């Protein structure tokens, strides 16, 4: 969500007059959430600006004991651990899109997964279990990769990517 707050010297510490939540859909990635939050912020600042300018807004101090700090996400955190459950992996793919992105390696090359959904196949974690790049995960789950980007190349739908790919059913990806 977003908060309408006074700016003070410390990061995110000013008093808040209003806070708004955003309903998230399962298929939202970080980029989509950022876009939605930007639109919500633009709308809500307009709703609050008159009260703020006329000193009618009621600002309340934040409870600083509940404050948290998110450290910078490092590129290496995008490496997929196929032993994790499919929902966790899809969460990582969506949460790290577009930058730094969630990725795997095959034959020394990096592949960024841009979009994926839950699959229904079973195999060993990291094993490609279909000709359409469905990959086995932990908990006897799988994900279907829908869009991918090979290092240094343009993004591709999986049907297009698989035409020239060396990643085949039975391959193990890391």
Question: Residues of each region from the PLM?
Answer:
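Short, flexible active-site loop motifs that bind/organize anionic cofactors or intermediates
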Residues: 23, 79, 151
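An anion-binding loop in the catalytic cleft
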Residues: 83-174
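A short catalytic or substrate-binding loop motif that flags glycine-/basic-rich loops and adjacent residues
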Residues: 72-74, 95-96
């Amino acid at each position: 969500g977003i908060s309408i707050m006074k700016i003070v010297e410390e990061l995110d510490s000013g008093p808040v007059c209003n806070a708004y939540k955003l309903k998230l859909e399962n298929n939202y990635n970080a980029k989509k959430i950022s876009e939605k939050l930007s639109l919500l912020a633009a709308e809500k600042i307009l709703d609050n600006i008159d009260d703020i300018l006329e000193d009618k807004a009621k600002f309340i101090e934040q409870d600083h004991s509940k404050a948290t700090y998110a450290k910078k996400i490092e590129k290496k955190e995008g490496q997929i651990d196929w032993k994790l459950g499919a929902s966790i992996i899809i969460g990582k793919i969506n949460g790290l899109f577009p930058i730094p992105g969630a990725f795997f390696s095959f034959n020394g090359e990096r592949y960024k997964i841009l979009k994926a959904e839950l699959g229904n196949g079973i195999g060993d974690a990291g094993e490609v279990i279909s000709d359409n790049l469905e990959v086995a995960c932990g908990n006897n789950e799988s994900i279907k990769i829908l869009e991918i980007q090979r290092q240094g190349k343009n993004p591709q739908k999986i049907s297009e990517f698989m035409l020239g790919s060396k990643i085949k059913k039975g391959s193990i990806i890391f």
